[in-house]
Amino acid sequence: MLRGLVHDPSARRMGGSPGHAGLFSTADDLSIFCRMLLGGGTSGPTQVLSQETLAAMMSPSTPLDKGYLRGLGWSLDTTFNERREKRSSLPIDQSGFTGTQLWLDIETGLYIVFLSNRLHPDGKGDVFDLREQIITIAVSVAADQATPAELSTKADTPNLRSLNLSTGKNQPHAQVLSGLDVLRAEAFIRMRGQKIGLLTNQVGQSRDGVSAIDLFDGADHLELKTLFSPEHGIHGIRDDRVASARDKKTGRVIHSLYGKHLRPTPEMLAGIDTVVIDLQDIGTRFYTYMTTMAYMLEAAAKLKIKVMVLDRPNPINGIRVEGPLLDQKFLGFTGYFPMPIRHGLTMGELALLFKAENDIAVELTVVKMQGWRRRHWFDETGLPWVNPSPNMQNLIQATLYPGIGAIEGTRISVGRGTGTPFEQIGAPWIDGLQLAAALNAKGLAGVRFYPVAFIPRSSKYAGRKCRGVFILVTDRQALRPVRLGLEVAATLHRLYPAEYRLENEDNLLGSETVLIQILAGEDPAGIAKTWRADEKQWRQLRRRYLLYPFWAKLN
């Protein structure tokens, strides 16, 4: 084995134990090392590093309040993030005393090897700015490989739906087991002797389509005592308030948590040992199922009732975060916790975060999924899509929802009451040709706009002809949906200020500052840059609650 001497006075002074970041190899060999890390710890058929080791690399081992995060052997808070316009969202790096550096982006798979000797000839060299320039150029070039102009050539067809659904093509499919599937495979042994309250809806079903209600009702050694339903009811088909009822098949009472009560009462929870929660979030802050779960955690804590969350995928992947943190003044049912609009967590991870950050003294268990990776979009999991709510009918709509859902409180229809909610917007006073031209001129990555006319059957402008735009997703990886919503709102305000009335928006954006910036006519690109500190703060906070590592193969 070749051994080298680290050129690091600090390491030498302390006997070599700290500061040993020297890179004794060639760029080619270090490239192999980087590809091994990005490949989930494997090199060819060989498993070089375990998933536990990789997870330790991505987990903070330094105090989160000290402003500088490190995992096992890596910086998790590279300073280049703050100084680069086209930044990576999930970089790690390690540098050496002589100026060497490895830099990897877990999200995109980009890595950079920089070998130098800044100490030659007088020991006073400084390569920090050079390294920053190299990383900036490399990231910018990688980000620009698929430009909006190139993407638009794929969209020259009237078959919008087929193109829209092709964004996940050629993606490898995993065989993910939900928390319910895992619990079922264990024959519900964790629930032995328990009296169960089940908070679920139509999405609570196994891979083969058996409902959670039927599985718990038929399980040995436990008693399904009562049911709870979130917004839209136990079958997920209601768009208004839902009254409590009785399940026709099992005879159990269904306590609605979107009717007279938003929080479970002590009477509803009487006689229950454990509340099991099996709900599908959509990856967006104002989707209310996470709030219903949080209210259940709070109620269970007061009554010393245990809670078990059966985890399910974040449909729009568990890596991306985007948007401003929720202002404290907007905390409520559509915003339980100060987080960006696109949060990048699963329901189980959200439960852990809510419990810890809000000091909810509940005994909480999360049944993890098997096979799910943070990079996975829902169509890469092998799980069947079940509409989690009436107007969330496919993955494209879920992808657009963080942006289009954030502005639906304004005087526009977002397609509710049509076959393509959140894929189109319009109003009787919009000129679709004008709006499409204005939005396409923005050159937003991953999306194109086409003039469209539609008549909603229900919801806003029901029965009236609306003109607007159809939103065609051409690259879901490049798309930033919250930025998209911001651009749409700013463009509508500029073109139709009297009709749009943005000042009356109910602020699902969650930020008074952003609303003021749009009304003042500020550039949306500049507004989005102001979110970076919020996004960084959220990434740092959420790290301690991640149940699924970034370092993992797709399958």
PLM-predicted stretches and their roles:
Residues M1-Q171:
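Catalytic loop of the DD-peptidase/beta-lactamase superfamily, centered on the K-T-G motif
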Residues P9-G19, L331-P338, G417-P421:
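Flexible glycine/proline-enriched surface loops and loop-helix/loop-strand junctions
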Residues H235-R241, M308-F330:
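Glycine-rich, charge-decorated loop segments at or immediately adjacent to ligand/cofactor-binding or catalytic sites
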Residues D240-G271, T284:
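Glycine-rich oxoanion-binding loops at beta->alpha junctions
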Residues D281-M293:
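Glycine/threonine-rich flexible loop motifs
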Residues L331-Y401:
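Conserved anion/nucleotide-ligand pocket segment
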Residues W372-R375, D379-P451:
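Glycine-rich, aromatic-lined ligand/substrate-binding cores of catalytic
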Residues G426-T530:
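Conserved functional hotspot residues or short segments at active or partner-binding sites
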